[in-house]
């Protein structure tokens, strides 16, 4: 085998990987972009949820979780005395309220459950506007909406697999990828798009691999269920598996005798002696108000690089510690660590910002890859002014998926401030607004020339984002100047971030419009001298 043969074989492998990289990145690229962007926002979902519920009081001082848990448990006992189960999520520094969920007999409530937010200072339920807050983006990024969560998660897993293949193929394809990381040629059309794509890819390459692989691991039992089905044969084995994956109270029949719950505060105190004063995340109850009551006190996520369950189980009446669940098998612990790396709940503020920034770069990596596909292929079209249907479809989907998604996410925030607070099914109507606006951006992209659609939608996103602080000042008692004066940094940070994102979209709109204003070359020179813009159209 000669040197020439080896070089030819190497080129053949790289060319094959190039095609694999291109098509795995494109076919589900629009889904991946939406997953990346909504996942990026989800790193601050607790803060976004606070902003979307301005009625909830701002908590100024650190509170004792044991006292808060007792207050809220007493309140649930008052407002839902027939609840068969309840769960209290305690604030861990990033939340200004306590969230609780309880199950009710169907005869009493057609839904079969109740939920609410509680003031940690008083323990009383707070009437806040109906919204999913940041949890909508969190859920959307791995199970989407308007479809069964099962099929949504399968689609997300398929997209993640495509992403992992595209990353590996991209590294093989770009033999000088690390060298090109230090090279950026501004204003060079296709070369500039490739340089930006390479830089965004290489800078966050370890993160992109980690976040994609760990995303698959979190739902591994859904994607590869056969091993679990073969290993788990009995209900007892199923319960043991559940206990290794979540805080799990074995289901039991209520006893014939009613009995008051023991001191929740005392049970939480026992947990604090093991984990620390502020490291309690949740309190669950089964059969409260019954002699068979059980209480589980679960450790919080902060500062713990594992999502494996760590909890204490108590007799709900006597308060006696029944069992300690602080160890799981090697496989479950590996899964717990990878899950924790994916969602980053262990992180402090600085680490969370690092997650956000690198994930935002991953979003841009996917976006530049989608745009580069149209940039490269327009030059190869027989008539770039009259592209084929497939090319036009990709181009319009790019516009709606990138610029249109920014508009839709911003419209979701606008709906939060403008919809009547007493509106029925308000939380769902916020989501409906998101999808209605997103659909309208696709319609707009189909009806307008590509470059005009890019510019108009980028400007629309910039304008809507820039006006959010104004809208917030007009519709709540927490405008930017007041929030800054009292140190309400969640509201300050949200308003400032909206302005920063508005500036980013404005810069992109201006640059795309300037490219479009350049004079076109003669058709005979177009192929040789084309300088593609964001829409992929030639300009010089």
Annotate the PLM regions.
Residues 1-540:
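Conserved histidines in hydrophobic membrane contexts and catalytic metal-binding motifs
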């Amino acid at each position: 085998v000669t040197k020439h043969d080896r070089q030819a074989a190497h080129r053949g492998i790289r060319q094959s990987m190039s095609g694999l990289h291109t098509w795995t990145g494109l076919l589900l690229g629009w889904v991946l972009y939406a997953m990346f962007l909504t996942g990026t926002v989800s790193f601050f979902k607790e803060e976004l949820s606070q902003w979307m519920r301005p009625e909830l009081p701002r908590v100024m001082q650190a509170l004792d979780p044991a006292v808060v848990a007792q207050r809220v448990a007493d309140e649930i006992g008052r407002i839902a005395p027939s609840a068969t189960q309840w769960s209290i999520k305690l604030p861990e520094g990033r939340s200004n309220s306590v969230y609780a969920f309880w199950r009710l007999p169907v005869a009493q409530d057609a839904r079969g459950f109740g939920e609410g937010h509680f003031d940690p200072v008083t323990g009383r339920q707070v009437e806040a506007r109906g919204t999913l807050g940041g949890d909508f983006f969190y859920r959307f990024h791995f199970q989407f909406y308007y479809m069964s969560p099962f099929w949504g998660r399968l689609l997300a897993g398929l997209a993640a697999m495509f992403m992992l293949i595209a990353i590996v193929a991209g590294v093989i394809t770009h033999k000088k990828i690390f060298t090109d990381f230090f090279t950026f040629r501004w204003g060079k059309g296709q070369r500039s798009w490739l340089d930006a794509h390479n830089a965004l890819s290489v800078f966050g390459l370890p993160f992109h691999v980690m976040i994609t692989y760990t995303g698959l691991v979190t739902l591994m039992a859904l994607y590869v269920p056969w091993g679990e089905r073969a290993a788990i044969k009995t209900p007892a084995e199923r319960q043991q598996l559940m206990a290794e994956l979540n805080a799990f109270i074995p289901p039991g029949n209520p006893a014939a005798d009613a009995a008051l719950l023991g001191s929740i505060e005392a049970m939480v105190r026992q947990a604090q002696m093991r984990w620390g004063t502020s490291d309690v995340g949740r309190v669950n109850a089964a059969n409260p108000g019954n002699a068979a009551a059980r209480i589980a006190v679960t450790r919080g996520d902060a500062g713990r690089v594992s999502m494996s369950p760590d909890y204490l189980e108590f007799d709900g009446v006597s308060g006696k510690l029944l069992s300690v669940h602080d160890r799981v098998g090697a496989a479950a612990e590996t899964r717990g660590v990878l899950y924790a790396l994916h969602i980053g709940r262990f992180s402090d503020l600085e680490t969370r910002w690092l997650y956000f920034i690198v994930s935002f770069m991953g979003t841009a990596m996917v976006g530049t890859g989608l745009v580069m596909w149209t940039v490269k292929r327009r030059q190869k079209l027989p008539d770039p002014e009259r592209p084929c249907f497939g090319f036009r479809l990709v181009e319009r989907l790019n516009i709606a998926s990138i610029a249109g998604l920014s508009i839709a996410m911003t419209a979701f925030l606008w709906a939060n401030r403008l919809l009547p607070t007493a509106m029925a099914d308000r939380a769902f109507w916020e989501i409906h607004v998101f999808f209605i606006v997103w659909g309208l951006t696709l319609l707009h992209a189909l009806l307008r020339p590509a470059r005009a659609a890019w510019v108009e939608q980028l400007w629309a996103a910039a304008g809507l984002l820039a006006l959010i602080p104004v809208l917030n000042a007009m519709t709540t008692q927490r405008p930017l100047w007041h929030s800054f004066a009292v140190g309400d940094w969640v509201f300050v940070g949200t308003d400032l971030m909206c302005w920063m994102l508005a500036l980013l979209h404005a810069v992109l709109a201006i640059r795309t419009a300037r490219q479009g204003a350049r004079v076109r070359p003669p058709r005979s020179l177009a192929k040789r001298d084309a300088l593609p813009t964001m829409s992929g159209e030639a300009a010089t």
